Amino acid sequence: MRKKYFGFLILGVLLAGYIYVPLPDNVEEPWKIMLLNTFLKTSSYLALFGEILGLNHFMKSMALFSRIQGFPPTSDENIIVKDTTFNDIPVRIYVPQQKTKSLRRGLFYIHGGGWCFGSNDYYSYDLLSRWTAERLDAVVISTNYRLAPKYHFPVQFEDVYTALKWFLDPQNLESYGVDPGRIGISGDSAGGNLAAAVAQQLLEDPDVKIKLKVQTLIYPALQNFDFDLPSYRENAHYPVLSKSLMVRFWSEYFTTDRSLKKAMLSNQHIPLESSNLFKFVNWSSLLPEKFKKGHIYKTPTHGSSELAKKYPGILDVKASPLLADDSKLRGLPLTYVITCQYDVLRDDGLMYVTRLQKSGVQVIHNHVEGAFHGTLAFLFTKVGYRAANQYINWLHENL
């Protein structure tokens, strides 16, 4: 009997050691973050093991594991929910049950997942869209798009743009009872990247007459030029989104060729002839002083021109919205940006805030202290719940 108890004790110690990860002092409910990280870490290990054995691609396995979050379209007494397609792109629509004679606000939402997994039917996305539709009395469109590694850039951008452009057709807006003067776009992480890129593209499309009233970018990924930002240095090994995982997301967005990932990890993937673009992502001039924290800017080492020729997407503004010239930013709508303290993507958002402000765009920046990447998806945490409410309240006041 004593041996059995001793065995359980050893097992408990090992399990606690596997779950425990040191976290900063200002992180609320650290055990919730540790348990979440344990699930993500275990999924990652299993996916990597399967890839090493040649059973499945890492991202395909991660997408498979994440499907446990899938939630069918379920209407309730307040919101009608249904799945349909906009010009063959799958979307989930949320429409308030209450009848109204006036037109409603419209929000077009793009999910995250590193362009490799994620879906509008994940429980956290479904719940956030449902809350948004109910509290704003708005029509919410939550779109899907084809994913890497099966599909690479610009497929994801094109899918989202196709769905949004269909929605913005005046006849389609009328059929859903949406006010053409009160439409916003929103996205988180990779979805924030797509939202920013799509908002820029709309300004150049003569076929689209409807103007967005707001854009909300939730811890967006906005550039693949420099992976040596202070946020990448400080948060490289924190839970949810490590530097190595984010770099893999970026490389898979363009190709399954591992040589690109290797070059990105060493920050040697941008050719000399494109060095003029670094001014758009130079954190030494774009980050607020309090986020520099004594970090020294290192001029990136230039990479092979062959990589850029094989994968021109790495230089495309549709993939990296921070590469847009100031003149292209000036027409963008009122913008709300969320960044998180412990997130490798923090500085992408901070730099975009600075560039938008310098271009005359009105920007509201909500920096969430003590939060990790993906916090709005973690509505079971206090910080995630607060951030979601702040996001919805801002939309209520400005959309």
UniProtKB/Swiss-Prot annotation:
**Disulfide pattern:** C116-C340
Catalytic residues, chain numbering: S189, D343, H373
Q: Where in the cell is it found?
A: Endoplasmic reticulum membrane; Microsome membrane
Keyword Lipid metabolism among UniProt keywords: yes
Membrane-crossing residue ranges in chain numbering: 5-25
Q: Which residues are glycosylated?
A: N282
Where is this chain primarily localised? endoplasmic reticulum
The entry sums up its family as follows: Belongs to the 'GDXG' lipolytic enzyme family.
Please give the function described in this protein's UniProt entry.
Displays cellular triglyceride lipase activity in liver, increases the levels of intracellular fatty acids derived from the hydrolysis of newly formed triglyceride stores and plays a role in very low-density lipoprotein assembly. Displays serine esterase activity in liver. Deacetylates a variety of arylacetamide substrates, including xenobiotic compounds and procarcinogens, converting them to the primary arylamide compounds and increasing their toxicity.
Q: Which PANTHER family match?
A: AB HYDROLASE SUPERFAMILY PROTEIN C4A8.06C (PTHR48081), ALPHA_BETA HYDROLASE FOLD-3 DOMAIN-CONTAINING PROTEIN (PTHR48081:SF28)
Q: Which named protein is this?
A: Arylacetamide deacetylase
- Gene name tied to this protein: AADAC
